[in-house]
Amino acid sequence: MSKQLLLGDEAIAQAALDAGLSGVYAYPGTPSTEITEYIQMAPITTEQNIHNRWCANEKTAMEAALGMSFVGKRALVCMKHVGMNVAADCFVNSAITGVKGGLIVIAADDPSMHSSQNEQDSRFYGDFSLIPMYEPSNQQEAYDMVYSGFEFSEKVGEPILMRMVTRLAHSRSGVERKEQKPQNSITFSEDPRQFILLPGNARKRYKVLLARQDEFIKASEESPYNKYTDGPNKKLGIVACGIGYNYLMENYPEGCEYPVLKIGQYPLPKKQLHQLIESCDEILVLEDGQPFVEKQLKGYLGIGVKVKGRLDGTLSQDGELNPDSVARAVGKENKSEFGIPSVVEMRPPALCEGCGHRDMYITLTEVLKEEYPSHKVFSDIGCYTLGANAPFNAINSCVDMGASITMAKGAADGGLFPAVAVIGDSTFTHSGMTGLLDCVNENASVTIVISDNETTAMTGGQDSAGTGRIEAICAGIGVDPAHIRVVTPLKKNYEEMKQIIREEIEYRGVSVIIPRRECIQTLARKKRSK
């Protein structure tokens, strides 16, 4: 078939569609969002009734995908790296249950934290779950891995983890597609107890997983994504993982003088590793992320061979890998031709003009400064996190999805008053509801501001699970309806908003304020599409 110019994310999505996908499950998060959006917009999705709705969070996405696999269908789960923390309960246990229909989990990592709280490396999740992993070096490999990965998942009976990174997810390349496969029919496991993880059966299933490890290593040794290329200069051997191989080849367009082991599939291929180790004086590990392979090699080799990489300072311990850092690591002259002109100023993200979060912060901060000058506000993950910046300087925390409510409760437990949390509507239904339940169960003196812009705005305006139902959810959890207050955050309503904020902050119990106004960007898109 002819080539298409695709983002790395789009290559994954197209491969899944071509491989007979029956459902994609995801919660939006950069740099993974475009995978699901591409599937949602593809004509074949409607034609073949491929499930494609956003989930409340990554845990529900992982569980629903496992359910799709349970009935023999092929499923894709997509999330950013910190979403793996949310999905981990089901993800780790799915390695023990195994799968029926092919199941691929995409974890899009964000080295350098372009839009994330940390730069954790998802390969560690695959490693301690004992399942096979893919790590593509380019868009074509991303496509090929997913296309064949469903069949591989069904063959070995396990979910497959695929790790992407921001630069690969959000850059384009020509991708050659393969033939379209039909969706699987409904089938069930021959073992009726496969998915029942009672301790007695879980122990049996775990032994099955352990028995598959040699098969996984053999698959890695025979994989087209793990390739050993010899070189004349044996002073150095290079292990290049994922996009690190791409950066290495940018420095050696005519071929590398050193032996190179390209890694695209895990567990590590022992046969090729021995070949590299036995012929080279020292080893350099290139990986875009934490020293996952480097640590394994140090333990694998003992003290016999020197291993260089992030741990010894050859490469920086934080931030992205790039062609320049690879050039320095192999002792090549840095020939970068482009610098950043001094006239180009930093333009940090800011709340949009006309955004309802602005009006919420202005009124909330005015009230708190007047009544409680030493106040603290606990916030969360979303556009409103930008309230940390000038001119608002309105919040004191941003840790993880849903943490605003439970951190405010913990602070209230410790004697802080007022304890104020700010959270968005999508983040509230993702991970905030259980925190609110804790507050209700203990009648904590907490004021929770659910700033409702009726969408998941920061990642591009995806559907929010609680749209139009936030008040009902709060009441259902047990918040007194008299202390669930809805306001429209507009300048003309400032005095009304400030009065409501004063009343609810002074209330000794659980109170919820919902400033509701549609995201200004979503509204603009709707008007343009008319």
Located regions from the model:
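Thiamine diphosphate
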Residues: 1-139, 167, 257, 292, 386-512, 520-528, ...
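Flexible, low-complexity linker and terminal segments
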Residues: 1-13, 17-19, 136-351, 356-357, ...
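Conserved beta-strand elements of the Class I
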Residues: 25, 76, 236-239, 284, ...
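Short helix-loop-beta junction
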Residues: 40-45, 249-260, 472-480
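Short beta-strand segments
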Residues: 78-79, 104-108, 161-167, 239-240, ...
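A glycine-rich helix N-cap at a beta->alpha junction
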Residues: 46-55, 97-108, 187-194, 441-454, ...
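Short helix/loop capping segments that flank catalytic or ligand/cofactor-binding pockets
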Residues: 87, 114-116, 170-173, 246-250, ...
